[in-house]
């Protein structure tokens, strides 16, 4: 195969991979989101791309991220649960003996992630059962401070999960976030409400300020 100066650069590294709900780089500001600002302005930045509005929204975008394939508009991620998903990041990491985890700060059952994500190669956990049996699936829950908040806090998700893997020598972790979920206002969006003061002085519409606040 073709090789260049980057070939093998990250061999042996650990990987934390995120799909960010409803996210746009418009939300990144050095003063309000310094960590995100650092992430997108250092290392490798890939900006020659476009993102269509997938018919099944979050699930199709997640399917593209996790598989590198184009969805067919019929809940491709859900359907992948019965397919042979041999060429995914967790499959490659697992081949090197790395334990692969996935987390989502909503329900286990939404979009049938409790079926699709283990089929990708992840040990998948969420904060709520979503109608699944506690006896069968209760071990797949992790704890956050405000599990009933909508949208739930990505920060609390990190607090509740990092301890499961951070001391491992090797790990691959995937996060499906939810903090940036619509609607963008200060009444129906808990994340926006919690961070309202941080954006109060911005000369923007309420929707724009609420969007920045929840991200």
Residue positions per predicted region:
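Solvent-exposed soluble domains appended to multi-pass membrane proteins
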Residues: 2-215
């Amino acid at each position: 195969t073709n090789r260049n100066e980057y070939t093998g650069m990250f061999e042996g590294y650990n990987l934390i991979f995120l799909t960010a709900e409803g996210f746009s780089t418009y939300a990144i500001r050095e003063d309000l989101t310094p960590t995100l600002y650092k992430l997108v302005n250092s290392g490798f930045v890939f900006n020659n791309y476009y993102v269509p509005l997938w018919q099944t929204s979050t699930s199709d975008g997640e399917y593209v991220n996790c598989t590198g394939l184009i969805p067919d508009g019929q809940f491709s991620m859900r359907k992948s649960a019965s397919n042979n998903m041999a060429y995914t990041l967790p499959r490659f990491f697992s081949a090197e003996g790395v334990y692969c985890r996935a987390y989502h700060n909503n329900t286990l059952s939404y979009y049938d992630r409790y079926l699709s994500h283990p089929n990708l190669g992840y040990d998948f956990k969420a904060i709520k059962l979503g109608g699944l049996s506690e006896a069968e699936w209760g071990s797949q829950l992790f704890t956050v401070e405000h599990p009933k908040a909508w949208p739930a806090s990505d920060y609390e998700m990190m607090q509740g999960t990092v301890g499961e893997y951070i001391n491992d020598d090797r790990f691959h972790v995937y996060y499906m976030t939810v903090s940036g979920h619509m609607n963008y206002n200060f009444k129906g969006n808990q994340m926006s409400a919690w961070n309202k003061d941080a954006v109060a002085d911005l000369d923007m519409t309420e929707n724009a300020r609420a969007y920045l606040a929840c991200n």
